[in-house]
Amino acid sequence: MYRVVYTKRAVKDIKNLKSAKLDNKARELIEIVKNNPFQNPPFYEKLVGNLYGAYSRRINIQHRFVYEIIEQPHVYNETDYDGIVKI
């Protein structure tokens, strides 16, 4: 299991997802990524360019969320994690 950390931008975007009624779909995808960031389906894309090293998953045709995986096992609040997923 991976620990999910939200960036400031992601926290702001959550409000937009709620207004577009996409927050439930986004939560489902985040749970999938939390358990296994490389799980298929739903499919993920490796990004290139400025976002090299990051991955994305589609919320719908127009929206997607981008995340970065930091493969570094650690303990947080007495829970063992395989790494961090930064959204």
What residue ranges belong to the model's regions?
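Enriched for short, Lys/Arg-rich terminal
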Residues: 3, 8-16, 20-27, 57-64, ...
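A short, surface-exposed loop/turn module that caps and links secondary-structure elements
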Residues: 31-58
